[in-house]
Each structure stands twice: as structure tokens, then as C-alpha cells.
């Protein structure tokens, strides 16, 4: 970065001469160094998957979760600094609870995404704060059907058919674009997301990983739940077989 060391990267409130805010770019870099998180919108719901890198062999399986429930009908996948992600999840839960207490119904996914994005953006406006070093994929089911959003460290949010963040995001996006999501069920989507995460994982450079998955669909009664173990094992087996077949070619 051309302006490193010249003082333009010392505060989130300082623009460089070419219009960049380096603190936000550094936060985005923290996300890019994280395990890959993928979300897809299928015809009957949302599937979220995360490549959770295992930092130590002594860690218990299932610890330091990267996928969290925000509300009955919405969930969030986190890439980047896990502690920052927990703070965003806590804020999202608070916003969802507050909306329901005021309006008497579950918060729409778009409203929740906008509120989370505004909170993330707030931390890019004042010199005594730092940007969140994480990005999140938010999936949910409301009166408009299944919806998928991604919130970046800059505080911007977009609605997607399929989204990916983290170390393997470019390769994951390429694979997502090949899928016919409008014709795919969540059961099929679970297998495809597992295949994508296994494919983008670099065994030579990356640590071992744990596949974490959840869904919000008609089969889960439109509630955010972990993918059942039998379906998760089936997806892992299909992903491993696809990877071995690709290596054989």
C-alpha cells in the first residue's frame, strides 16, 4: 500500500490523498485471512457453511463456533476475528429482540441487515474506535421468503443469491456461480456448499478445519438450526469423494 508509514493509516477518520481509508482495508484483510464462509439461497431456504480452521489439536470439536443463531428465523456466519464476530452477533440479537418487543413480530431480514450494517459503519466514523475485523453473512426467512445478506467491515451490506467471504472467497464465488440455485433444494445445497468449502481449502498452506453448517428452510420449519448430523456426514462424504475424483483427474 503506497501510503503506509506516511500517517494516513493511523486513524479510521483519515483519508489518504487517493481517497482510501487504510484502517478499513486492514480490517478487510483480517477477513481475507480467515477461513472461508459461504451462504446460498435455495428455492426453499438458506444454507450457511464455514471452514472453521482448527488452531490447535487440543481444541474440543465444536468450540469457538463461527455460525450463530440471531433469532428464531435468522442466523449469521462469521469470517475474520471471532471475538469481533461475537460482538456483532450480540448486537444483532439485541436488535432482533428489540424489534419484536416493539412491533410484535419477527424482524424482517432486510431490516436486521440494515441495522447491523449501521452498527458496523458506526465504528468507522470516530477516531477512538476501530473497524470490526470481521465480515458476516446473514441469512433468514420472513414474509418475503428466504433472504441472504452480507455485511462487510466498511458497514456496507448487499443482498445476494450466493455469497462468500474469507480466504477462499474468489474460488468459492466462481463455484457458486455455476450452481442453479433457483432449482436447488436446501438438502442439495448442503452437499454443494460442503463441496465448495472442501475444494477451496488449501491443505498445503492451511491448518486442518472443521466444517460447520446450518440451514433455515421449510424442512427446519423455517427456523435457524444446525444441519442434522446425518446430513452433515453425507455432505462431508460427498465433498471428500468429489475432491478425490478431481485429484485423480
Curated annotation (Swiss-Prot):
GO terms for cellular component: cytoplasm; nucleus; proteasome core complex, alpha-subunit complex. Disulfide bonds: none annotated. Pfam families: Proteasome, Proteasome_A_N. Keywords: Cytoplasm, Nucleus, Proteasome. Gene3D superfamilies: Glutamine Phosphoribosylpyrophosphate, subunit 1, domain 1. GO terms for biological process: proteasome-mediated ubiquitin-dependent protein catabolic process. It is found in: Cytoplasm; Nucleus. It comes from the Eukaryota. Belongs to the peptidase T1A family. The 26S proteasome consists of a 20S proteasome core and two 19S regulatory subunits. The 20S proteasome core is composed of 28 subunits that are arranged in four stacked rings, resulting in a barrel-shaped structure. The two end rings are each formed by seven alpha subunits, and the two central rings are each formed by seven beta subunits. The catalytic chamber with the active sites is on the inside of the barrel. The proteasome is a multicatalytic proteinase complex which is characterized by its ability to cleave peptides with Arg, Phe, Tyr, Leu, and Glu adjacent to the leaving group at neutral or slightly basic pH. The proteasome has an ATP-dependent proteolytic activity. This is Proteasome subunit alpha type-3. It comes from Spinacia oleracea. The gene is PAG1.
Amino acid at each position: 500500500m503506497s501510503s503506509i508509514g506516511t500517517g494516513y493509516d493511523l486513524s479510521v477518520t483519515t483519508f489518504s490523498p487517493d481517497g482510501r481509508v487504510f484502517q478499513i482495508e486492514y480490517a478487510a484483510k483480517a477477513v481475507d485471512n480467515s477461513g472461508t464462509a459461504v451462504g446460498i439461497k435455495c428455492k426453499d431456504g438458506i444454507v450457511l457453511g464455514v471452514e472453521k480452521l482448527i488452531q490447535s489439536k487440543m481444541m474440543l470439536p465444536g468450540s469457538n463456533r463461527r455460525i450463530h443463531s440471531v433469532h428464531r428465523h435468522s442466523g449469521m456466519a462469521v469470517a475474520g476475528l471471532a471475538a469481533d464476530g461475537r460482538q456483532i452477533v450480540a448486537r444483532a440479537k439485541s436488535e432482533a429482540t428489540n424489534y419484536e418487543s416493539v412491533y410484535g413480530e419477527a424482524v424482517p431480514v432486510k431490516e436486521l441487515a440494515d441495522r447491523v450494517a449501521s452498527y458496523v459503519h458506526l465504528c468507522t466514523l470516530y477516531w477512538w474506535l476501530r473497524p470490526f475485523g470481521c465480515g458476516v453473512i446473514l441469512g433468514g426467512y420472513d414474509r418475503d421468503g428466504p433472504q441472504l445478506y452480507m455485511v462487510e467491515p466498511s458497514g456496507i451490506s448487499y443482498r445476494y443469491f450466493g455469497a462468500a467471504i474469507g480466504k477462499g472467497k474468489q474460488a468459492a464465488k466462481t463455484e457458486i456461480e455455476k450452481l442453479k440455485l433457483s432449482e436447488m433444494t436446501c438438502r442439495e445445497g448442503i452437499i454443494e456448499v460442503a463441496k465448495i468449502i472442501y475444494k477451496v481449502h488449501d491443505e498445503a498452506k492451511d491448518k486442518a478445519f472443521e466444517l460447520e453448517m446450518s440451514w433455515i428452510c421449510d424442512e427446519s420449519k423455517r427456523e435457524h438450526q444446525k444441519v442434522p448430523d446425518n446430513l452433515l456426514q453425507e455432505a462431508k462424504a460427498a465433498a471428500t469423494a468429489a475432491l478425490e475424483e478431481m485429484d485423480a483427474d
